């Protein structure tokens, strides 16, 4: 197949005001720019088919209607692939969450700079490219899986090998194994041996035996006095729905965020929203520390706060400030984590934590 992209490479932002685009839409009876894109992809497919080729496109080609013989590469989750399969088309599952090997595979500060994210070996191995809800007659339309390695941050072949191996071994086993027979502990033991074999052959795989793993507390809950307590958000402090981390209880569930803001464990505040939360301890409580972790990754515009204020109250109305921290945000290419906290002795029922965005 010949793959054609139709997202960043052919953005549609200018099409509504493009005279040529509008003229073509009118001539072909197309109601919107998505249908114009579909018209374009269909014409390309006809050309490719006439030359003995098949068209394979990223899941954006679903917008406006699929070309008759197209295969869909599902990268924004598996939903695009499922839509293709449901309409009788072939699909290749390649979701970013499991198949983008340009993400960090271990603690970012232990690895060469990467594009971001966190995709360890175990996460790759956990991928199921054929959802359980897929009917038996549709399974054959899932053509396979694909790993992707974009090389903006990969300057050498040796670096590329490190990003590929051993994660590609995990994806290969995902592709040929029924989920019922997969066993990560067994695979991990075999992967350790394969890494040594690859080294002996002159390759440069990731040093799996010295893997650090996820952030402490990201996989196993930690205990503290505020776990399970009610959290109230200020009127101008709503978190962004796309980064809810599980909702209003996320900041007191005992589970911290991992190495990536995309792991659904970090709450994000955008636009004019700021973090302003009050925790109700239910009764006057001795408090010795209050803190919250923040992440900064400048590329996708995830920044530290410029100021944090921690205060307490017994009535939920009048608060006494315990600590105010100013922070100079340094914009660089690193993935950094900082805990802004207070330690001391206080007694209160309500704890308020505020930040101001950089």
Spans of features found by a protein language model:
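Active-site neighborhood of glycoside hydrolase catalytic domains
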Residues: 3-70, 75-83
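Residues that line or immediately flank small-molecule/substrate-binding pockets and catalytic motifs
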Residues: 149, 235, 294, 355-357
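Extracytoplasmic/periplasmic, Sec-exported soluble proteins
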Residues: 32-36, 160, 302
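Flexible, acidic glycine-rich loops studded with aromatic residues
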Residues: 54-58, 65-70, 76-221
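Short, small-residue-biased leader/transition segments that mark boundaries at the very start
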Residues: 1-5, 356-358
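Trp- and acidic/polar-enriched beta-sheet ligand-binding modules for extracellular glycan
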Residues: 270-274, 297-357
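Hydrophobic, well-ordered secondary-structure elements that form the walls
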Residues: 48, 72, 168, 290, ...
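Disordered, acidic Ser/Thr/Pro-rich linker "stalks" and the adjacent N-terminal cap
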Residues: 215-287, 295-304, 324-334
């Amino acid at each position: 197949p010949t793959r054609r992209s139709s997202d960043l490479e052919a953005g549609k932002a200018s099409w509504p005001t493009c005279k040529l685009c509008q003229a073509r839409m009118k001539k072909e009876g197309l109601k919107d720019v998505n249908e114009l894109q579909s018209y374009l992809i269909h014409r390309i497919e006809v050309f490719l088919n006439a030359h003995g080729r098949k068209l394979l496109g990223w899941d954006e080609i679903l917008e406006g209607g699929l070309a008759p013989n197209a295969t869909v590469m599902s990268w924004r989750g598996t939903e695009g692939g499922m839509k293709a399969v449901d309409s009788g088309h072939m699909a290749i599952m390649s979701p970013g969450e499991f198949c983008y090997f340009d993400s960090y595979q271990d603690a970012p500060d232990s690895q060469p700079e990467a594009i971001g994210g966190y995709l360890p070996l175990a996460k790759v191995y956990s991928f199921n490219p054929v959802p359980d809800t897929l009917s038996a007659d549709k399974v054959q339309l899932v053509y396979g899986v694909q790993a992707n390695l974009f090389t903006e941050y990969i300057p050498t072949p040796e670096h590329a090998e490190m990003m590929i191996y051993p994660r590609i071994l995990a994806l290969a086993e995902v592709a040929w194994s029924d989920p019922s027979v997969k066993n990560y502990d067994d695979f991990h033991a075999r992967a350790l041996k394969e890494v040594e074999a690859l080294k002996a052959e002159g390759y440069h795989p990731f040093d799996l035996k010295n893997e650090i793993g996820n952030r402490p507390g990201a996989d196993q809950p930690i205990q503290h006095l505020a776990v399970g307590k009610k959290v109230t958000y200020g009127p101008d402090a709503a978190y962004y729905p796309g980064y809810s981390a599980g909702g209003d209880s996320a900041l007191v569930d005992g589970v911290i965020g991992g190495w990536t803001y995309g792991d659904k464990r970090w709450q994000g505040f955008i636009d004019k929203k700021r973090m302003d939360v009050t925790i109700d301890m239910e009764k006057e409580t001795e408090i010795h520390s209050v803190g919250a972790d923040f992440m900064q990754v400048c590329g996708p515009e995830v920044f530290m706060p410029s100021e944090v204020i921690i205060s307490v109250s017994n009535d939920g109305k009048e608060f006494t400030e315990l600590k105010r921290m100013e922070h100079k945000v340094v914009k660089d290419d690193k993935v950094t984590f900082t805990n802004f906290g207070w330690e001391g002795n206080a007694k209160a029922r309500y704890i308020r934590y505020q930040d101001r965005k950089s």
